[in-house]
Amino acid sequence: MGQVLSEEKPAPLSHEEIVKELANIFAEKCFTSLELYSLKQVFKSLADHEQRVGYLKEGTVAKYLKVPGILDVSAVLFQMASYIAAFPFLEDAPAVLGLEQMVIVITLVTDRYRRVLGKRAADKTKLLFKSLAVYDRKFAKPAVDTPSHSKNAREQIGSDGQGLDNDELVLAAFDALGHVGSKKQQNMPAAHGAMIPGDNFRKLIMLLLLVAPLDGQDSLDSDPDRVTGAGLQSLRTAAESILAAFLDVEQNPGIEYHRFNKVIAGCLPFLFQGLAPLFEHFLFSKELDFHKGKGDTFRSPVMPPEPRQPLLQDTGSIMNASILSQMSFFIPGSFLFRRIRLLYAGDLDGFSMGSFETKVFNWRAPTILLVSGTRLLDESDHHSNGSVPAFWASLPPRRFPPGSSGEGERLAFGVYIFEPWKLTHRECFGGEETILFQLEPIHDLFRASPLNKDYVSFTRPSASTSHAGVSFGCPPPKPSQAYRRSGMIPLGPVSLMLDGSFEYGCFTHDYASSGGAFQTSMVREYNFQERLTLKAWRSGAAAGTRKQGTKQNNGRGKQEKLKLEGESTWGRATLKPTEHY
């Protein structure tokens, strides 16, 4: 015939075919055969069908995960899942939650993707932001619930800039797939005006606080007290404090990416970790029965599970389950949940440095100190002969305005101390693992600086010491007459000071200075100072199964005199020397 057949290039794969290929890779390398079987069984039992295509609806997902209706977060969670389901073609979002899409969602949310995409794709912050963001609130669209709406939704989203450019996670997925043509998707335009609505993020934070202590098979409805009454109020309070780190709701309608990324990296590195055990619920099918063989008619009895330690054995006027969850966003939850024990309570053991020393100093494990109080009014408003004027006089004359505008609002600070407590003579104690943080009314974090070692001091009252007390980030007392005559408490650039009576405290943030024991805030780039009258404070350390008792004494009389509510100390189990964070 003499004709040479020209080589025909294979037609490029469609988005659907590439997504299916990626889902197969994830399924093979990121799941066990039992997990895949369970996922298929769960999906089969939950899926609705349209045009012979199975998919999950918003209400179905929320009901299966037992998301409390009082949180009103189902739509936000479904929007996030539907966006991630379109990966790596995020311009196709929102996607229908079919079986393959659920494989992709679970792989990404639980961080299993690292087994395939490698270290290059270690951070999914951009993906999470885009999954929660809207690009024009006026035309914001709900997530797709059925296949028939999918095409129309894609057309509406169109080319308004669906994502932030240079997403390493997306690029790593294209590299893993090896489809050169797919890399054209790298050139998506950057999003303009993309932001997460503050109200949506508040709802999600409440859910994240709720799921933070859960294991893979724990249910969201296992502790109904957390979403009713005082438990619900504490969830809302913690969520408002965390939201305030991202956004001033009175000035901005939403959270932009640069702020989102900055706060997550600096203050809340573990914020989204609770989503992993939540979505792993899809990998546990209730239909699996390992106690029954083929053809067996008799089912062997199932041994009841061993009782678990409570999430928090002791609560107080500061410490509760929501505060514990909030701290787990920057201290690993494995250090906190079911591991902390009350060491010292001021309203039970007495408000004195001696009582504190007796209860805490023999503890040889890390501790957490929490302090709560009410902001003092301006110095000019105090004309009494009480202790307030004396406290004001002990502070250096250089004063900063408060960190927020609310008069008389509750303030809460804390310190994570890795080393055991000891008396301070000429040198402070503590190490670079020490963390100074604020919990209310705004969440903030001040990590230790390696340049200055004035981390923690505990100074007893004595004739040679003009000011006793507990301080963090302040220089230790000096044995000189000039120091004693000054009558001033030396405050560090970033520091927390509690006076010797545990009646007053002062937090200082000198943003313009450098060389302090703690780094300045990544959230508030300005100077501020909080002078407060202490209402409650506690410090913490936990230890395996060792229990620390508390006893009542005459501390309540002093509590009324000082208008204090409580004081306590918490501790956790001893860590191996290599365990740092």
From Swiss-Prot:
GO cellular component, one term: cytoplasm
Alphabetical keyword list: Cytoplasm
Signal sequence interval, chain numbering: none
Region listing for Disordered, in residue ranges: 539-581
GO annotation terms (biological process): response to oxidative stress
Pfam entry (one): TLD
SMART domains: TLDc
Top-level division of the source organism's lineage: Eukaryota
Regions of compositional bias (Basic and acidic residues) in chain numbering: 557-566
Keyword field contains Cytoplasm: yes
Keyword Cytoplasm attributed: yes
Residue ranges of domain TLDc in the record: 317-540
PROSITE patterns (UniProt xref): TLDC
Localization terms from the record: Cytoplasm
Family that this chain belongs to: Belongs to the RTC5 family.
Cited function: May be involved in a process influencing telomere capping.
Name of protein: Restriction of telomere capping protein 5
UniProt organism field: Sordaria macrospora (strain ATCC MYA-333 / DSM 997 / K(L3346) / K-hell)
Species classification: Eukaryota, Fungi, Dikarya, Ascomycota, Pezizomycotina
